[in-house]
Amino acid sequence: MPNIMEGQLEGRGLKFGIVVSRFNEFITSRLLDGALDALNRHGADPGAIDIAWVPGAFEIPLTAQKMAARGYDAVICLGAVIRGATPHFEYVAAEVTKGIAQVSLNSGVPVIYGLITADNIEQAIERAGTKAGNKGFDAAMTAMEMANLFKVMAR
């Protein structure tokens, strides 16, 4: 019979880093509220949660890398990149996505992608707690599950 390994949705005993982009703060603050709500509902100690605000999404991967190196069980990355009239959206969204994945792979720490990439403000608002749930909440749930899975795998 195979040995099944799964992470539980439990925040107790875990330390979380959260990186939040200040750009589009009217969206990202809702993502942060969602992430904190999920962690709180699942028993995370508020004193074991550190939040780093960064100017924009492009600064998220480097800050996540610094957090991953400091002993967090998981790092949650939150931001909102909204398409405009120039190709800036594609550049930022692609590089931030690659950067977050690279930090996770290089550090061995779950670094969770909780960014909204949207065509317009309405889509971003929907994904930050209205019609389409809250991507910050979802990212925190993933962070807890992955951190606990890694603890199971380390046994």
UniProtKB/Swiss-Prot annotation:
Highest taxon, organism lineage: Bacteria
Keywords: Riboflavin biosynthesis, Transferase
Residues that coordinate or bind 5-amino-6-(D-ribitylamino)uracil: F23, A57, F58, E59, A80, V81, I82, Y113
SUPFAM superfamilies: Lumazine synthase
GO molecular function terms attached to this record: 6,7-dimethyl-8-ribityllumazine synthase activity
Residues annotated as catalytic: H88 (proton donor)
A GO term from the CC aspect: cytosol
Positions with a binding annotation for (2S)-2-hydroxy-3-oxobutyl phosphate: A85, T86, R127
Pathway listed: Cofactor biosynthesis; riboflavin biosynthesis; riboflavin from 2-hydroxy-3-oxobutyl phosphate and 5-amino-6-(D-ribitylamino)uracil: step 1/2
Claim: GTP-binding is one of the keywords in the record: no
Family annotation (PANTHER family): 6,7-DIMETHYL-8-RIBITYLLUMAZINE SYNTHASE, 6,7-DIMETHYL-8-RIBITYLLUMAZINE SYNTHASE DMRL SYNTHASE LUMAZINE SYNTHASE
Protein's name according to its UniProt entry: 6,7-dimethyl-8-ribityllumazine synthase
Organism of origin: Moorella thermoacetica (strain ATCC 39073 / JCM 9320)
Taxonomic placement: Bacteria, Bacillati, Bacillota, Clostridia, Moorellales
